[in-house]
Amino acid sequence: MIRRAGVVLRDAGRELRGRDLSLWAAGVTFFAVLAVVPLALVALRGAAFLGSPEFVRHGVSRWADALPDPHGPGPALSALTTAALGTPWTALLVTLLPATFYGEGLLRGLVQVAGQPAGALVGWRGRLMFVPVLVLSPTLAIAPLATADTVAGLYTRGGWPTFWGITLSFHIDWLIIASVTAIVFAGSAPRGVRRGPLVAGAFAVAAVLAGFFHGFLLFLAIPLDWSVPFGGLVVVGAVSALILWLYLLHVLLLLGYRLTLSAERTQLGAGGIDAEASKTPTRSPASGQVH
């Protein structure tokens, strides 16, 4: 197992050597910033349709009350919920297009990590790939809203109840993120790569992302003034902190995708890499012949 892990890590390192993963993650983050609010509007409005507006308001309010105080996002969540429930359906349909931009950004980044040519239609392919996520988003939003009373109650009690609340919310977030990651990984599979291992890898990557999400909640509890580097502009500081978190999240996502591809590529162990390398033509320095 340890030897296999070493083979996967070395293969991923070779594929990423000399390539700008940070730039790719920044590109994905740009598209995410365009899409995250429209996506949240669709998810919350759909959850209200499946449940009720009061169900959504109550769930969001309970989560807002349970989050750390120093940078509590309660007002922002309340405004987002009001917009989601009050926007006419005709106007809400307009948000579907920018919501799919996330899929375009993800596919562009994943294609680069896989070392594949993007192609002229990569943007539309990514948006179409993300449509199932949009369709599922109301259902995925119901899970944290339905468990808000339980989890928020555990969060605020301290001690072991808080631990169990974090454990419960981690698994809820993991299943939600895993569903999205599996769709994205399967939809972006390079030619010749089986989708089954990519979906399995998506669940492992989702566990890391869910843990990172909970780390961000811990970051919210640190009483730092985010506005200091921006001349005291509170909104700018908060938005910049969120964008930085999204950027780091996408770095982890792209790394996880590369490791998943390398795990599939090296499934036969180091011998699989040697066999693949033996197929690569080599030129004899003496004769100049290709062997």
Give the ranges of each region predicted by the language model.
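Membrane-embedded alpha-helices and immediately adjacent juxtamembrane helical segments
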Residues: 1-291
